[in-house]
Amino acid sequence: MRTTGSVLAVVPARAGSKGIPGKNLRTVEGRSLVRRAVESARRATRIDQVVVTTDGDAIAAEAVAAGAAVVRRPPELAGDEASSESALLHVLDAMSTPLPEVLVFLQATSPFIDPADLDAAVARVVDGHADAVFAAAPSHAFLWRTAPDGTAIAVNHDAATRPRRQDREPEYRETGAFYVMRTAGFLENRHRFHGRVELAVVDGAGAIDIDDEADLALAEALAEAPGEAPGAPTDARVGAPAPAPTTTRDPSPTRATPAPNGAP
């Protein structure tokens, strides 16, 4: 791994999952979700190293087979209450090499991450246009919420002068597929959204997030439909021998504090 201007991709993949047991090892088009994430990152030309952080032996073995290094996550950072940020901070603490300039956080639950989208997002950060870039899908949805008394309240539109859907400016839904950020800014702010934040607009299959069996079935159907989703990897980097595992050391307890949102 280069010591200057390097880009590290991290795929958090816990062994536990309430929605779909063993979710990160479930397959789409014959490849596990964690393998698909690793292979997408390895096909991106601007990513130098890929690390999977996990508490599961089977996931660790799958990650190495896919070409990633592995950082073993301690139990206190692998529960439902642990945050994604805590997993990323633990990986950075565990590294024996100088820290990367740019950190790419990928979620295995997004099975159709396009390497070209990763490269474009990394370029925005490396070239100084943004401090953080994340995947988001356009939406023209009319959103509502309910008041304590059950009354429906319009959130993102005026219900009395409801415009045509096609006339509305799109809003954007965070897909969770990937986040690209300056490592220094992430360490300083301890969250992924810092400085100037930009969107990497994705749509269609690229916006899918696997949360339940129906999502998995949809992803499988898209994978089998010609031209609907990215196919199997063909890049020479994928399938090459795995890099040497990342050397780990005891992480600083002050830099890996869990936050409220659950980690993958």
Protein language model features and the residues they cover:
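Histidine-centered beta-alpha loop that forms part of the nucleotide-sugar donor binding/catalytic region
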Residues: 14, 75, 137-138
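Short, polar loop motifs at secondary-structure junctions
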Residues: 54-59, 185
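N-terminal glycine-rich phosphate-binding loop and ensuing alpha1 helix
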Residues: 2-53
